[in-house]
Each structure stands twice: as structure tokens, then as C-alpha cells.
């Protein structure tokens, strides 16, 4: 008899779900969008939109996943009593397969830099020009592909061990370490001269800087930041027992995700202000700007290694769910088939990701609609598949998913005031969230 995957504890579910949401964007993009768009004003808009958009969508994925208790691609057909709805699950499966194929490229770069920095600790070589070093790494086919393969192997190892022994155990180690490293780096960053100028630059409200672009980013980020629209949270919820309170768990996950984004800014901007270093975030921040910054500090190599580990943990806890969902889809969450399909899907992901890994080297001149293969895949997932998936998920939950099981899953069927909250949740899913998703989607092409 096949053994269905399940969480060993509520804490494991919360940490794994938060880890899924806390990806590279939360650490190297969100703080810069915050600072550039009015600091505290942007944060306020983001918090409000997360409550009105992200949190309701998160609860929708949780309710759907636990109610169905099957793989993501079968969830919608089962709950909608018609297999035609399974296309929503396939959107997520396709998006996450593509996402892991290029996400693993960045994960590989982090592994390479960790090796370089550990080598510096033992005086096994210097680095010199960091911009030149980064270019030499990403343009070298052997290094790029080898690093990508190593990162995918790490994901295969974790996912093949199962939900409890693999994903949950890894999350219970990586997520606390991520927060501990953040505290250490924030403490060091705030101890530097002129650190408070960086804090004010990051957090001081200035609504005059909150542009329409920034406003739309805050709205979009409210569901992107929680890995919504690609059935990641739905899949994790399908492994839950019926006792776990989904609303309380959702609040914890949202709080952790927002906290990490704010902590990233507190770690970065005070140090950058102290040494008068500028950056717009993204890969250049981690691989060029930060090593230059830490070179100016006592024990800088150690602090940079901690920062790289922080990014690695954020990357791995996000990437394992990308592989896990499709392993669950193919095996129908049967653990006896998990190891074999983890390897097969990992290899397929690596092969599909080869053009992305080579996009900064031998395939740099290969373009799709004016974009490198890496950027084209990023655009396909982030700008097309995720918004469309979130829209379909919102409409399915609002109009197709039966009210009774939804209320039961969310524990909002007991008292009148809870039933009132359920009606508000349903209204948001039916009307408010779809309109906002459509507006954000159209605005990106204008």
C-alpha cells in the first residue's frame, strides 16, 4: 500500500511554507523597491495589499489543498467535479518546472562564490576585480553548468528524502539559521558609522516618491511574495492534517515573509550608507557590490560568507517546492515512487535549464523577443504564468469551490462573526483580487 506524504508537525509546515515564499526577490529586490518608492509609504501600501490580496489568496490555496488532499493537477478537477478545471494545476506545474530551470542557475552561482570565499579564509587565493570575477564565472560554460548541476543535485537529495525527512527537516535547520544570520549581520551593519542614514533611507515615509510603477509593484508583490498562483502553497497544504488552523498558520507565514524583506533592508542599507556604496539590487548586489563592501570591514570575508549562506538558504527553501510539486503531481504523492521521480525530474530540469545557464556566455547572442533565454523564461513565469495562475485560482475558489468545505477548512463556520469574515474573503476573491491582478497584468505592458 502506498504511503501518502504528510507533515510531521505544524511548525515544519509553517517553516517550509515561509521558506517557499522567502526567495531571492525578497532579499535582493524588495528592499530596493521599498527605498526607491517612498520607504515607509511603500511598505504601508504593501502591507495593506498583502492583507487584502496576498493573505486571502494564501488561504484559498490552503483550503483547496487540504480539502482535496491530492496532487495539485488533480485538485481542481476533484473539487470542481470536472477534470476540465485541472488546467489550473497544470499552469502551476509548467511554471515551476521553468522557474527551477533558471532559478538553479543563480543557486549555482551562490555555491561557486561560497567555494571562493571559503578558499580565501584558508588563503587559497584572492579575488581581485569582483565585476571581472562575476563575468568570468557566468560566461564560463563548465563552471555555469557544473554549478547549476550541483544546486539541482542538492534539491534532488532533499526532495527524494520525503516531506518529513527531507523538506521539513531542511526547513527546520535552514529557516532558523536564516533569521540568526540576519540578526548577526543587522547587528554588524547598524554598528557602522552613518548607519542610521541608511535606515532612514530605507524606512522613512516619503509618499512623493511613491510612483504609479511603485504602487503597481507593491500590489503585484503582495501575491508574488507569497509564492501564490503556482499551487506551491496548495501542495504543501495537501500534506496537512485537519487539526492545523489554516488562518493562524497563514498569519505566521505572512509575518515571517514580511519580516525577512524588512530585515534584508536593515542588513544592507546601513552598511552601504557607511561606505557610500550604491546598487540597484539583483545579482550585481550579491556578487559584485557586497563583496566590495565586506572587503572594507574587519573580518569581512566571514560576514560575506554568512550573507552567501543566507542567500543559499533562501534559495534552497524556495527551490525545493518547485521540484516537490511536480514530483507530487507525477507520483500522486506516493512516497514509494518519490526517489526515482526526483532524479528524473531533476535531470529534465537541468537539461531544460542549460540555455539559461549559458545565456551569459556562449548563448549570449541568442534572443527570444529581444531577451536572453534566461530573461525570457523569467518573463514567461513572473509576468505571464504567475498572474494568470493567481487569477484562475481566485476565480475558482470564489465561484466553483463549494462554500461548506471552504468554511470548514478555514474554521469560519462556527459563529456569526466568523461567517461574516468568510463572506468578506469570498467577496475579495470574486471581485477585488481578480480586478487588481488584471490591472497589474495590463500595466506591465504599458
Q: What kind of feature is each model-predicted range?
A:
Residues 1-28, 57-62, 66-79, 83-90, ...:
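Membrane-interface "cap" regions at the ends of multi-pass membrane proteins
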Residues 4, 74, 107-138, 239-243, ...:
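Helix-loop-helix connectors at the membrane interface of multi-pass transporters/channels
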